[in-house]
């Protein structure tokens, strides 16, 4: 079976765009980061140490199982709730998902810089009647923009 999201021949940013199209309501943002790909990807791939530094709702991440590119994570949020996530991690591509959320990163070199895309999607979000879907989506995009800025700062600091 041809799975376009799994194909290694597809540019990772394009792969993330395909994934976003399959997840209605997913928030996706991109940022051109003024750091080389290796420095940026080192931050993204350091799930245990870096994730709590750029993701405000995450307190701890622990890799509890690793089989090549496939990982099982135990993620604790800032309220103390734990959730198991399955992840696929390889250079330029990180997909993490649980029963409630899908999170993905895609990156590619852009000269001496990096193009980094980030997707977040809640699987079980039922909007309240008084809640504006577009307001929630804008807030999610603003949150992702902040996360991408923090990843850029961490990548630049790591290069020093």
Label every model-predicted segment.
Residues 3, 49, 66-73, 88-96:
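Short, hydrophobic/aromatic-rich segments at coil-to-beta transitions
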Residues 29-30, 61, 82-89, 101-109, ...:
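Hydrophobic/aromatic beta-strand elements that line small-molecule binding cavities or substrate pockets
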Residues 40-44, 50-51, 73, 87, ...:
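Hydrophobic pocket/interface hotspot
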Residues 95-153, 157:
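Beta-strand/loop substructures that line and gate deep hydrophobic ligand-binding cavities in soluble
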Residues 72-85:
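Helix-adjacent hinge/juxtasegments
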Residues 34-38, 66-68, 90, 107-115:
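A short, structured loop/turn motif at beta-sheet edges
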Residues 2-7, 78-80, 98-105:
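Soluble, non-transmembrane catalytic domains of enzymes that act on hydrophobic metabolites at membranes
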Residues 1-65:
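Hydrophobic ligand-binding cavity/cleft-lining segments
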């Amino acid at each position: 079976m041809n799975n376009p999201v799994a194909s290694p021949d597809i540019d990772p940013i394009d792969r993330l765009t395909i994934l976003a199209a399959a997840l209605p309501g997913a928030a996706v943002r991109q940022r051109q980061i003024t750091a080389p790909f290796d420095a940026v990807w080192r931050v993204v791939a350091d799930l245990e140490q870096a994730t709590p530094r750029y993701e405000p709702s995450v307190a701890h991440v622990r890799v509890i199982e690793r089989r090549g590119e496939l990982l099982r994570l135990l993620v604790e949020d800032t309220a103390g709730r734990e959730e198991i996530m399955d992840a696929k991690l390889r250079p330029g591509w990180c997909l993490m998902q649980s029963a409630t959320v899908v999170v993905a990163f895609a990156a590619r070199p852009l000269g001496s810089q990096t193009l980094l895309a980030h997707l977040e999607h809640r699987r079980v979000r039922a909007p309240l009647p008084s809640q504006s879907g577009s307001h929630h989506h804008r807030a999610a995009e603003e949150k992702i923009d902040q996360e991408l800025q923090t990843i850029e700062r961490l990548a630049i600091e790591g290069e020093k």
